[in-house]
A protein has these predicted regions:
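Short, structured beta/alpha segment
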Residues: 166-282
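Positively charged, amphipathic and often flexible ligand-engagement surfaces
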Residues: 1-216, 222
């Protein structure tokens, strides 16, 4: 939900799922999360010279989560695109529960949580009869270093000042912590129907190159963002331009040794690893 174009991704999934079900296929499932790789998105975009793709505030992220949640639980959508509500935020969980009750789509929804993060919440969910998927991290001893990044993320979530889990221990109504979290939810709820869903990532390699004016500071050209459809089309055109076939006349590049030019008449076929089973002639 931290991506502005998450709404478009949900639209694509819904269109695919509806066509699949209408054609006699089974529904698919979408797992809705708030900020699984949010920090990494910021780091990667900075290193590659791209705009930061995430929403600028936690309130906007929460609002987008509620927007996608409401859309996903509507009967016409939930029957083809089942929803996994991944959250440890009591207010978000309660909102999803009430929405599903309102729309009659409880059977198409599961709650998804992490072992050890908020065990009292998933236990309460189970007591209510809700379906809960509990994720438990498992790692072999020889791969334990791979768990460090996971543990650091969990520690960060449990200590971030705006994060629900920071205030969740011994949380009670009519306390300072409760009022703070309730206000967070109310602000997000008020914003959910007024969001724009436009990504700041608009790089387009099809456009003519515009030289950058000289400056005292050297700036690298941003890396090409191959996630963007317009850049994928740009690459396809380049590939089509230079793609060779085994039936074509090979380009002859003579070998020059000193003043002598040597042209070999032998022809050999080699597997072109860029074109699967095609061969190029040398």
């Amino acid at each position: 939900a931290y991506l502005p174009d998450a709404y478009d991704f949900q639209t694509e999934l819904l269109e695919f799922a509806k066509a699949r079900v209408d054609g006699g296929g089974a529904p698919i499932k979408m797992r809705l999360v708030k900020g699984c790789n949010l920090e990494m998105e910021t780091v990667i975009s900075s290193l590659k010279g791209w705009p930061n793709p995430i929403r600028p505030s936690k309130t906007e992220v929460d609002a987008n989560y509620l927007c996608l949640l409401e859309r996903g639980l509507m009967p016409e959508n939930a029957r083809v695109l089942h929803l996994g509500v991944a959250s440890h935020n009591l207010f978000s969980i309660a909102y999803a529960y009430l929405l599903a009750q309102k729309y009659g789509t409880t059977g198409y929804m599961t709650f998804e949580m992490l072992e050890g993060m908020a065990n009292h919440l998933w236990r309460a969910q189970s007591m209510l009869g809700n379906r809960v998927i509990l994720y438990t991290p498992v790692v072999k001893n020889e791969h334990f270093l791979n768990a460090v990044s996971y543990l650091v993320r969990r520690m960060d979530e449990n200590t971030a000042p705006d994060n629900f889990l920071t205030h969740s221990f011994n949380l009670k109504p009519d306390t300072k912590e409760w009022d703070f979290l309730a206000k967070q939810f109310e602000e997000a709820y008020a914003m959910k129907d007024h969001l724009t869903h436009v990504s700041p990532c608009v790089q387009n390699r099809n456009l003519p190159y515009t030289p950058v004016a000289p400056s005292d500071t050297m700036q690298n050209e941003p890396d090409t963002d191959f996630d963007l459809s317009q850049n994928q089309e740009w690459v396809r055109r380049i590939f089509a331009k230079w793609k060779k076939s085994g039936t074509e006349e090979p380009e002859i590049i003579p070998l020059q040794i000193g003043a002598e030019t040597v042209v070999c008449k032998n022809r050999y076929k080699y597997l072109d690893r860029c074109q699967n089973d095609e061969v190029c002639i040398c």
